[in-house]
């Protein structure tokens, strides 16, 4: 029989891998955003997004942009595809984090 520690460790590994996938897709989106949507790139502080002095309110602006699916009106298919990927990976990572935390308290 599989122990609770093994299940929790496996959940933590899967969650970690998916969070890395999410951050990589987000970095790729910001790189593409520089050419595809320069105004949004400036609004979300594209150069300083992943720095320690990054402006949180500008980062929240990107979150709301993706959450409300404003990218559907954009003309660039690559940009909209990246936004969809980031949105999906964010939802997946958040759900996995919730399940992992729940499992940590139960097990």
From Swiss-Prot:
Q: Which residues form a coiled coil?
A: none
- In which compartments does the protein localize? Cell inner membrane
What is the scientific name of the source organism? Vibrio campbellii (strain ATCC BAA-1116)
Name of the featured protein: Universal stress protein B homolog
Instruction: Provide the primary localization.
Output: membrane
This protein's GO CC annotations: plasma membrane
Keyword Lipid biosynthesis set for record: no
Q: What is the lineage of its organism?
A: Bacteria, Pseudomonadati, Pseudomonadota, Gammaproteobacteria, Vibrionales
Q: Report membrane topology.
A: Multi-pass membrane protein
Q: Which HAMAP family match?
A: UspB
Keywords, in A-Z order: Cell inner membrane, Cell membrane, Membrane, Transmembrane, Transmembrane helix
Record's family? Belongs to the universal stress protein B family.
Q: Which residues cross the membrane?
A: 6-26, 86-106
